[in-house]
């Protein structure tokens, strides 16, 4: 189902830009398909995918920031250092998994 936000942010600007709304619908979300510059596409699915990628990128940025914080505050005590390194290793594993989900890993 198409939300009001998607109509405002995606469909209305497309119509104003000269894109043609077709009489066919997206099999995935039910939105009308559009044609612009010879390309037929579902603007709602593209918008949702872009939004999802941005959210995933935000998560990765938070994890990388935490990784940097740990890297710049390594303790001198060996036991504490091992805990820091374990946490850093786990963060790297999670970051790698996010990248795979995005198709970048």
Swiss-Prot record:
Domain of life: Archaea
Family indicated by similarity: Belongs to the UPF0148 family.
Record GO biological process: DNA-templated transcription
Species name: Pyrococcus abyssi (strain GE5 / Orsay)
Chain ranges passing through the membrane: none
PANTHER family documented for this protein: PROTEIN ZNRD2, SJOEGREN SYNDROME/SCLERODERMA AUTOANTIGEN 1
Protein name: UPF0148 protein PYRAB12700
A UniProt-annotated Pfam family: Auto_anti-p27
């Amino acid at each position: 189902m198409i939300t009001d936000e998607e109509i405002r942010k995606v469909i209305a600007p497309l119509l104003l830009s000269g894109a043609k709304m077709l009489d066919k619908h997206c099999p995935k979300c039910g939105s009308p398909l559009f044609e612009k510059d010879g390309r037929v596409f579902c603007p709602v699915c593209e918008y949702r995918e872009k939004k999802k990628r941005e959210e995933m990128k935000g998560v990765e940025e938070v994890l990388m920031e935490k990784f940097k914080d740990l890297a710049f505050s390594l303790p001198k005590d060996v036991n504490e250092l091992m805990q820091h390194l374990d946490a850093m290793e786990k963060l790297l594993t999670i970051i790698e998994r996010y990248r795979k989900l995005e198709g970048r890993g």
